[in-house]
Structure formats: structure tokens, C-alpha cells
Amino acid sequence: PTSPAASPRRGDGPPHGAPSPDLDRRANYGIRRVEVQPGNIGYIDLRQFADFEFGKPDQPARKAIEAALDLVAGTDALIIDLRNNGGGSPAMVGYLSSAFTPKGADIYNTFHYRQGTASEAPADWYAKPRLQTPLYLLVSARTGSAAEAFAYTLKNAKRAVIVGEASAGAANPGGQVDAGNGFGVFVSSGSPLSPITHTNWEGDGVQPDVAATPATAPNVAKALALETVLKQTQPANAALDSRWALEALRAETTPPKPVAFGDYVGSYGALVIGQDGTSLYLQRGRRPAALLTSLGDDLFTLTGEPGTRIHFERDPKGAVSAFETRGSDGSSSHYRRGG
């Protein structure tokens, strides 16, 4: 016999049962943040695998994850952040996995219970799977249960690179049983098995392909994504944008040698280069100042906006006399000091 759905697992949902529809809505169905990061890298911060029923395409959780995927559909690579995801619904595990794998692929875990089995393979398949997009999953010791199932499935299907540390190791479904005197005991009701590994991640967790601390994992994954994208064939401007994003990321994480900011401070026509403590910034009139990150050799990038660079020019005596702004789209402007 086959049970209709996999049971909740350790780490799935709040301690007193499944979230209410209103709590799910307020939590945006686990989707904390979706954005396109520098270098055209997609990023989804997913905190929960929200539940929904197959056969009902208008259910809010399903529409929410589809909207998130649509927002990053044009990106060159995608990072899904599971570092703070404790789990959730097997239905979402299967559906989201199908967004990156071929329809009907034999990759999904099957849960074995005393009363039967249940597969995480989705009853409805994602309509527009991205089969070639480089995919990176961030995991930590907080990553549990359904989030681990998702990472385990895509790792063993060789469809995603796992970045971070070993996950929680909570594979087996079950629940708390009253042991009396105010004590409870977790009792497993079954166990998942992968058709690829013929085992699961219970106790050991999902092991990373690339080790990183929870704090450094996002930048490690971004660098891996940009390096992969740069190996692919791209239009010239897109390749330049990716390369500048990677160089800026490296500069922000491993700053170059100390820079004499005083050399650059001053007015350049309508623009001002100023110094605030150990930071250099660019400002036009009353507009918010933009911080600059040094790339070395009189070259800077706008912090957080690596598609714009500033190159300072020096006169024959070595004094800074002007700067040029350059865009990865080919645009440029020139500003003389005091002009």
C-alpha cells in the first residue's frame, strides 16, 4: 500500500503543530527574500517548505514559490539559501526539486512506514524547469528535515552544489510520545530512502561539496557561481559584468593593501570624493553617498554595485587630477579635479 503523503519530520514547523494559513501567509510561505544580485546571480532565502495540495494550482504556497522562481528566471545562476530552514512539506520538496530536474527523473526519496510507502515525487511537475542553470544550495547545522531532503535529492542527482556545513541529520519522520512526568520521547515512524544512494542523511546530515561557515557560505557560493558563469559563452558586456562582480566580491572579502584615501579626496566638478573614517565615498549634491571599494592601482568600484568602476588619473607629478567612471555596459564619463 502507498500512504497519501509523507509524514511531518523532526524540525518541520512549530512545536505545537502545523502553521495556520494566516501564519503561513504572514511568513510569506517561507520565502524571506528574493533578489537578483550583482553579476546576474539569483538568490532565494527560503526559511520553510510550505505545504500545499497537488491538483490545486491556485494554492497560495504554490503560487508564492512560482512567483519567486519567475523573478529569478532570467539569471545566469541561482543560489537557494537553506541555512535557516528547519523543514516543512514533502510536497514542496518534490515540486521545487522538479523546477531543476527532468520530468519523471528517478531521484526522489521514498518514505517507508509500517503501513506503506510514500514518494516525494510531485503529482504536478513544475512547468518550466531550468535544467542547465548552475544551482547552489546553502546549508548549515540549522538546515533540517524537508530542507535536507531537498538538498540531498539535488546533490545526489548531481544537479546542485552544496555549500556550507553538514546539515542537522534529521531524516526520519515521527513525533513526540508522552513518556510521563512531563517528559516526551521522539519516536520515528518511518525512514526515507534515496533511489540513488539507497540510504538517507539520518544522523550524518547532508554533507557539503564545498565547506564554508554559515557566515561565509553566501560569498563562497557567489564566487563559485560567477566563476562557473565566466566559463560559459556570454555576450561581451555580460561577461564583463560577471567578471567585475567577481573581482569586486574578492576585493570586499579580501581587501587589498591600505590605500592613501587623502590622495583622492576633493571636488571633481559636480561630484565630491570624501572620506568618512576608513571609507571613501562618492557623492553628487544632496544625493546619498555611495561607498567605494578599492581594487588597487587607483581603481575602485561602487560598493554593492560592481557594474560601475572609478579610475583615478594622476598628473606627471603623481597627484590625482581626474577620474573616469566606467560601466560594464560600455558607458563612461570623465571628471576633472576642481573643474
Language model features: what each stretch is:
Residues 1-41, 241:
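Extended, small/polar residue-biased N-terminal targeting/export presequences
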Residues 28, 32-62:
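STAS-typified acidic loop motif
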Residues 44, 80, 135, 154, ...:
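Terminal peptide-recognition signature
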Residues 44-45, 74-86:
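Short acidic catalytic loops
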Residues 54-76:
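A short, well-ordered alpha-helical element
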Residues 87-138, 142, 172-178, 189-195, ...:
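Gly/Ser/Thr-rich loop/hinge elements
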Residues 199-202, 206-245:
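Low-complexity, Gly/Ser/Thr/Pro-rich intrinsically disordered linker/tail segments
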Residues 234-339:
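Peripheral terminal and inter-domain segments
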